[in-house]
Amino acid sequence: MPQHIAFAGITGNQLFRWLENHKYCGRCGSKMIKSENERAMVCSECGQIIYPTISPAVTVAITNGDKILLARNARGNFTKFALVAGFVEIGESFEETVKREVMEEVGLKVKNIRYYKSQPWAFSDTEMIGFFVELDGDDHVTIQEDEIAEARWFSREELSDDLPQLSLSFEMIETFRCNKHR
């Protein structure tokens, strides 16, 4: 299935879930109706407007010369390695989130934070914002065990060339593998 078709289906599912979860106003309990002017729900009584929930999150490619740090999530049945990622907190910039998430999840300091690109991720109502960063100091990894099951440095040669291109994380890993991230 072409990627754009898959994303259209996933996005449709995201909108369906949003509509199903916002039938009634959280302020006064009245029925919500679809706005005629924009993608929003409007309370039929108090006029409160609710927009689709989109949570910003970062995904971070941590590089150390010719190596990249990949981690495996401790939650769920994740068997593949991916990039370090996490949600932006209230009052936090994307760059601050990058530094905090990397320090929390793998105990590393990073520098030279460079924006790569973003991707809507409808599975979790998220907008993923991708960054490449460089290790700043010691490369010893200390994982946050409730978040990360395993993390380690991979050389380009150790990275598979058949990664699924559906997620931004895997696209960024492939970009690093092909040495196109600079």
List PLM regions with ranges.
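Active-site-adjacent beta-strand/loop module that shapes the phosphate/pyrophosphate-binding cleft
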Residues: 119-142
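Nudix hydrolase/Nudix homology domain
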Residues: 1-22, 78-81, 123, 145-182
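Active-site proximal loops enriched in glycine and acidic residues that flank catalytic Cys/His/Asp
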Residues: 72-73, 85, 114-119, 135, ...
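N-terminal strand-loop-strand
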Residues: 40-83, 87, 109-110, 133-137
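Cys/His-rich short segments
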Residues: 11-61
